[in-house]
Amino acid sequence: STPYFKELERQYGFFRVYETGWPKADTYFSPETQLRPRNDRPVILYPPTFTRNVCSAPHLMKEIELLAKTKPWDWIITFHPKLTDPDIIAGYKRIAAENDNVTFFEGPDKMPLLQRADAMLCDSSSIILEFMFLDKPVVTFRNSHPGPHLIDVDRPEKVGPALERALSRPEELMREIRAYTMHHEPHRDCRCSARVLDAVDDYIARGHAGLKRKPLNLIRKWKLRRQMRYYPLLEMFRR
C-alpha cells in the first residue's frame, strides 16, 4: 500500500509518508514464534469471528462435536470477547466438557494458541492472517473473501475433509499462503516497531520543513463539529 500513499504525498505535499510495516507482525516473525509445533496429535484451533452475519459458530457446532468424537485431533476453541450469545457459548463449553480432546479457552492472549495449533478452522476473522504469518494452513467456512490461500467450504460436512487436506500441508496451498502473507507484510526483520519510532523521531527533527500548508477544509471542520456538537466559541460566550 505504500506506493499509493507515496503518490498522495507527492500530490498534496502537506504530509509525509513512512514505510514501517505492521508493528504487531514483529511478534510473529521472531525465531521463537516461527518454530513448528511438536504435538502428539494434530491440534485444530477454532476462533470464530463475533460478526453476526459471518460468524460460523452457530452453523458448525454439531459438525465440530462430531469431528471431536470421530477424528484423532485435539481442539482448542476460543471466542472473541464480543461473541456473547449465551446459547452458543454454552453449547461449545458443553462440547469441551464432554470430550477430553476439546479445550475451551477463555483469555486475552491468543499467541500461545496460534503457536500450538497445526491448522485453523475459522470464518472471516482477522486472526486468519496472523495465523498464516506462522506458515500454517486455514480452513474457512463461507469466507467473505475466499482465495487460493484458503481452503474455503460452504457446508459443515465439508469441514472434516478440508481439515485433513490442510493438515497434509499441500505445497501449492503453502505457496499461496506465503505469497498472500508476503503481500500483506513483506517486512520480516522484526523491526517494524523500531521503524515507527524512527519515523516519529525523524518527523520531530525535520518539523514542517518542506511541507505545504495544510488546507483549511472549513466545510469538513464544520461538519465534524456539528456531528460532535463541539462549539467552543459558543461555550465561551455562554459563560
Regions found by a protein language model. Give the residues of each.
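Active-site-proximal region of nucleotide-activated glycan assembly enzymes
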Residues: S1-D26
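A short helix->loop->beta-strand "cap" motif at the edges of active sites that frequently abuts
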Residues: G13-F15, P72-W73, D135-P137
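Nucleotide-activated donor-binding/catalytic signature segment of Leloir-type glycosyltransferases, i.e.
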Residues: I89-E106
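Conserved catalytic-core segment of nucleotide-activated headgroup transferases in glycan assembly
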Residues: Y18-K93, V153, R188, C192-A194
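Short, conserved active-site loop motifs that form the nucleotide-linked donor/cofactor pocket
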Residues: V17, N101-T103, L150-I151
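A donor-sugar binding/catalytic signature common to diverse glycosyltransferases
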Residues: G107-L150
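C-terminal amphipathic helix plus adjacent low-complexity
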Residues: P161, L167-R239
